[in-house]
Amino acid sequence: MDGGGSSSWTHVSKNLIERRAVKGCLLPTPSDVMDAAVMALKDVTENIVGQQLFSVDRTNALSVIHTNEVPESIIATAIARDTSRDYLREYEGAAKCNLAATDLSHDEMWEVVIKRYWRYLRESSGAEVVDRGAVGQATQSVLSVLLLQSTFGKKRLSKNPFKHKGPNVGYKSNLEDLRSAFTKIEKYMYYMRPNDPMTKSEDTELRLHELLAYVTTCYRWLLWFMDLTDAKVLRNIDKGPVITHGPRESRPPDELVRRHLKSGPAISAGTGVALTLSTATADALIVLLRMSVSWTSHSWKSNTHGVTGAIVAAVELVTLIHHHLQYIINTVFAGYVCWLDGGVENSYLNSALRSQGRFDHFVGKLVPIMATLSWANMEKGTVMWFKYALAKSIVCHGSPTQHYLTVLESIASKRTGACPPQGSTFGRNPSGFPGQFCCPPQGPLPAPPNSKTRGTFRRCRPGSLRSSRQLPTSPPSNIVSPRTNPAIEGSTAAKNVQGAETIQVRSSGEFNDCIWYINGAYPHQRSDSSSSDNSTCSSTETQYITLPSTPSPTGDVVYTNPLLGPDEEVDASPQPVDPMSDYSAPKNPDYMRPRSTLVEEVWQLRDSDYTPYMRPSRAGRSRVRVEDQTLEPSSPAGCNPPANSPENDSDDAAVDSPPISPEVVYGTFRPRAKCVYDQYGLTALAALSASRAKARRTRPGPTQPDVCRERDEESAEPRHDGFIRRTMSTTGPPRKHPDQTERVSSL
């Protein structure tokens, strides 16, 4: 028995220590900690992000793709299944909580908007506008109304900005189409993210380029729209500007839209990986183009309430578009910047940020900009998802990749204002990323082997650790550092008793906590006519114009040279753009390719006497052009004008119609691109372009009756030095009125 027991114990005790040490010791390893951290982040993230990001179908579809790309079919499926705006659940809840905390009625919100606009108009134009009381400080309620009301409010503040019922109904329809397009673009951006933020994704980069180019175009449209609105307001209240600048945006909307539709990043790439996105951005831009026609041609009510109603509706439209564009830029800063080549130094991102900074410089007194940190406090899901994705990627790769380190170094270089020193760049060791848990050693460091020097340790003085954490070199994990002294730097961060999220904004003239990503600080006054990237204090002289004591008969605003910066002469030149010029995009051969010039575009077939926006044609007359000493309206084949357009009338009706009063001048206005009233897709635009080019090449000559009729008209209508006089009625003698004479330039 003893021998058997001894033999049994010998066999059992052979690996007893090893087995107990392996199976019984629960000391966590670094891999255990990382796995637990990743799982904890995943549990938290799943509760606050859209469910489609963690759906089984998406996970299975991406598991068979061995690259860091997301096909458009997966994105389109997620967009179609998200019918309840699940992607915006957390952000929308925080926004509505902010609006509820304002405790303002409908009339009080109206007063907030109209007072802010009068103050902005007085400071931007110099007109003597008397409002009913000062606006006061930018409180939390005012900021919530100006930033969130137009997007998340229960109803619109101003429902009828125009004089007649028809334009108001059309404007409501356009507004609904615009909201739908914005939602589709935001959903696309939300669900297009790959799984690995530390690996380059070419398809995602191209989609980000398309979104950022779209942001640039929309901000330029907003500046044009504010020029139009301010001019019409001053004309309606019989005020003239004292300090006049050039137009803040010199290109009309149709050129801005054509430029993006023709040669945007997604179209120029020709790969088809962003076809759904390019269609969505094109739909939004075409709706903006239709709104340009509405606000240019339709009149307002002449009474005081009519003017203020139009102002409130215009501000609502501007804040709606501005909030949508801010969502795109803040989402890029929340994590999507890791897929941009060069990080924050990407040229498309810089162009979008410069457009936003220019908008803030001129319109910031009216519409503030939300700080990225405030946006992240409301949209917690995106920030949390990137933390989870980065932790999972570090576990898979073992260390940060070189691509991710390059993005971090681009952010660090913007913080310090220059490239980091040679020895301060981030390495692959996780200890090279300082955080809130980093601290100096609490004891002497051991001396290296075979070293004659002893390990020395000098304990830091009290408070030195805290001071070391307040150095300007902030951790690379924070995209934007919070302000340290809100009272001095002018930040607004108010807290309410209901626990709503606060909003931090930066007014235009104050110090910018995100100055590292805007190429122009714009610290000078708004009356300056240019900005410089090299000097934050240099500015050109304000141009003054002495206006007569009585307002001009036309009531138009007199502009001087365009208000541009020294580096914007090519991008925002007032000269007409070359029809075959390319999109002003970064020189990237991977995404830009030469385009064929064999097919003429729709916009190249303009009449020779077209006029830009805010300059309508003569009352009751269609634009004409001279061809072989004849006078005939231009009506291109394949494009039917609108129902209220003068081109719908026959030739006899155009001659026999009675004269129209000048009050309906804007009713006969039509845009330079005559086929933008319907929602044309990219395919329809290409087909329309080809058909018009073919019709122009095969245009038949005039028939014999037409020639006889033209000769009779030539003999009956005398010419005087390039002017052509046209009779509006055949029942009486020609009227000697200067408004019935128009200048027609020969082709």
UniProtKB/Swiss-Prot annotation:
Topology in the membrane?
Peripheral membrane protein
This protein's GO CC annotations: host cell plasma membrane; membrane; viral tegument
Where does this polypeptide localize? Answer: Virion tegument; Host cell membrane
User: Per the record, where are the segments of Basic and acidic residues compositional bias?
Assistant: 707-724, 736-747
Query: Known InterPro entries for this protein?
Result: Herpes_UL46 (IPR005051)
Q: Where is this region: Disordered?
A: 437-484, 525-593, 611-665, 689-747
Per UniProt, the keywords (alphabetical) are: Activator, Host cell membrane, Host membrane, Membrane, Phosphoprotein, Transcription, Transcription regulation, Virion, Virion tegument
Q: Name one Pfam family in it.
A: Herpes_UL46
Compositional bias, Low complexity, is annotated for 528-540
Q: Which residues are in coiled coils?
A: none
The role this protein plays is: Modulates alpha trans-inducing factor-dependent activation of alpha genes.
Q: What is the protein's name according to its record?
A: Tegument protein UL46 homolog
State the organism named in the record.
Answer: Equine herpesvirus 1 (strain Ab4p) (EHV-1)
